[in-house]
């Protein structure tokens, strides 16, 4: 008995050591925001917090150098993105108090006891409004800014249309519009590029999973599409050619998520995220569903983005009615301008969004 206990303890100790040396083990404590001398900024916030939102425990990271700054609610795409800030700093926390919320079923908010099919679009929209209300109350601000990325834009724009009085402005990064048409355009692009490259293996994989307006996206297509896009530099980031090295490893070595939370990041990614709503996403034309908004609207889009179509987002921008609107093309970005071109993103937010202007926007 003692020998078995000693053996188990030794295995646990070795396992713990390997986790530490690999960088996977972490305390999960948010890093403080400090000055040049390493002293914590007195008015700053850097914390992980959990709330009961519409009956479900949900988590978020709050970061800001001064709690009196404007509040920015950041709504992620297919999976939470806060961990990326350790490798790809955004600087958002220097201008805003940023709420990196892990929405229902994702990351900190993942709950294996809640079946994905029970999570509805209506719940996502209601949760966005509940988080906005929490932030408004906690930081004593009448309104917050809402920034959404990729799949998050599908929910966020509908929340803005429903309750514009809660928000100063909406920033859509890689805005979804007509996602089925976006997937069809991407499929045609990928087939053309891999045929030109003479990559018959990838070409066969793509041709085995054709995307059509009539039949949608077949089983297995999205995994092939992701690998094909990243090889061409038109996936998550223009300079990212592998999800493993560009996303998975940064998530597993993040110091601000515990090991268990890191595992929940990926469980949520594969079982919840946008996928339970994929059929609804493909069937929805947001340009028809939300033809106008009552607050300033800003679209940030990478020209190399083939996850959410750049041309379709621009067409929507041209047609949508808003009191102020601006479209910003990022020439060095694919799907994630805030991580790929953070300085320009921050300048747009600081100079245009906060002032309700479009001086830095694209010109005809």
Pin down the residues of each PLM region:
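Short beta-strand element of the alpha/beta-hydrolase
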Residues: 68-78
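Glycine-rich "HGGG/HGxG" loop immediately N-terminal to the catalytic nucleophile
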Residues: 82, 105-119
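Conserved alpha/beta-hydrolase
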Residues: 92-111
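Conserved acidic catalytic loop of the alpha/beta-hydrolase fold
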Residues: 123-143
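A catalytic-pocket lid/entrance helix-loop region that shapes and gates access to the active site
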Residues: 156, 162-214
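Alpha/beta-hydrolase
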Residues: 197-288, 295
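Short beta-strand/loop motif that positions the catalytic acidic residue
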Residues: 293, 299-301, 305
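Catalytic histidine-centered segment of alpha/beta-hydrolase-like enzymes
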Residues: 333-342, 346
């Amino acid at each position: 008995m003692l020998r078995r206990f000693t053996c188990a303890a030794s295995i646990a100790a070795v396992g713990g050591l390997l986790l530490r040396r690999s960088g996977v083990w972490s305390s999960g404590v948010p890093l403080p925001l400090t000055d040049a001398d390493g002293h914590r900024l007195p008015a700053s916030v850097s914390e992980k917090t959990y709330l009961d939102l519409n009956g479900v425990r949900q988590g978020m990271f709050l970061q800001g150098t001064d709690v009196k700054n404007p509040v920015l609610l950041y709504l992620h795409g297919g999976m939470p993105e806060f961990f990326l800030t350790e490798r790809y700093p955004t600087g958002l926390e220097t201008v805003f108090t940023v709420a990196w919320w892990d929405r229902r079923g994702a990351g900190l908010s993942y709950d294996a006891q809640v079946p994905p099919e029970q999570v509805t679009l209506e719940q996502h929209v209601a949760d966005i409004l509940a988080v906005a209300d929490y932030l408004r109350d906690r930081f004593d601000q009448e309104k917050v800014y809402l920034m959404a990325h990729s799949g998050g834009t599908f929910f966020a724009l509908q929340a803005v249309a429903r309750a514009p009085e809660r928000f100063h402005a909406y920033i859509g990064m890689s805005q979804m519009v007509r996602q089925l048409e976006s997937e069809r355009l991407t499929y045609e692009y990928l087939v053309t590029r891999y045929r030109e490259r003479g990559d018959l293996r990838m070409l066969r994989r793509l041709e085995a999973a054709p995307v059509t307006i009539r039949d949608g996206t077949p089983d297995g297509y999205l995994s092939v599409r992701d690998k094909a896009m990243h090889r061409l530099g038109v996936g998550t980031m223009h300079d990212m050619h592998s999800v493993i090295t560009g996303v998975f490893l940064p998530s597993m070595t993040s110091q601000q998520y515990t090991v268990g939370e890191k595992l929940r990041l990926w469980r949520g990614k594969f079982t919840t995220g946008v996928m339970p709503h994929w059929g609804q996403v493909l069937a929805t034309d947001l340009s028809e569903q939300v033809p106008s908004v009552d607050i300033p609207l800003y679209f940030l889009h990478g020209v190399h983005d083939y996850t959410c179509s750049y041309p379709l987002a621009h067409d929507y921008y041209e047609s949508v009615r808003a009191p102020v609107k601006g479209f910003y093309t990022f020439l060095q970005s694919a799907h994630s301008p805030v991580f790929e071109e953070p300085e320009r993103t921050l300048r747009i937010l600081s100079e245009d969004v906060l002032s309700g202007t479009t001086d830095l926007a694209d010109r005809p």
